[in-house]
A protein has these predicted regions:
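Conserved core segment of the aminotransferase class I/II
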Residues: 9-93
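Conserved PLP-binding catalytic core of the aspartate aminotransferase-like
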Residues: 85-137, 156
């Protein structure tokens, strides 16, 4: 919560927007759960933000799903559910960090260049190989191809598969 204290020093004409996606945090994939919070010292700016948000957010993203919001509401109003959620979140976060750490160690060991990784579900690897997706599929590796990079979903990997995966990617990069 301390981070929000920085917003107290904003100029009167500034609108800061804080966004949050609950879909991944709460493992509610596909539920479109999240928030967009406008912060300003000006009531007029906040009123405009609310009015524009009502139309633009609904036009782009539909509306927040009621079941998803109900689940989150139950988690945070029940101390037992909240603690269980926090315990599970810690386990998941620790596992994701361990997978990322191992991938990064293996990438360094095999001189596999990656884009800076600061956390999250994906690690991105630059490539000049225009056939990288096809080459990796032939080696039974499935990644997300993008322009000049591939994204590896480390959230879906078993720890013991990571060293071999890095070697296969390095072979085709």
């Amino acid at each position: 919560r301390e981070i929000f204290e920085a917003y107290l020093d904003l100029d009167d004409e500034v609108l800061a927007i804080v966004v949050f996606s609950g879909s991944k945090t709460f493992s509610l994939y596909g539920f479109r759960v999240g928030a967009q919070i406008g912060l300003s010292k000006s009531q007029e700016i906040i009123d405009n933000f609310l009015r524009v948000g009502d139309y633009s957010v609904r036009a782009r993203f539909s509306s927040v799903s009621q079941p998803g919001m109900n689940v989150i509401g139950k988690i945070f109003t029940n101390p037992e559910y909240k603690q269980r959620f926090l315990d599970e979140l810690h386990i998941g976060t620790s596992l994701l960090k361990a997978r990322a750490s191992l991938f990064l160690q293996e990438a360094e060991k095999h001189d596999l260049q990656i884009l800076p990784y600061c956390g999250g579900f994906f690690i991105s690897v630059p490539t000049k190989n225009k056939n990288i997706f096809k080459d990796l599929v032939e080696d039974h590796v499935y990644v997300i191809p993008m322009q000049d990079i591939i994204r590896i979903a480390i959230s879906s990997l078993c720890m013991d598969e990571i060293p071999e995966l890095v070697r296969k990617i390095k072979k085709h990069i």
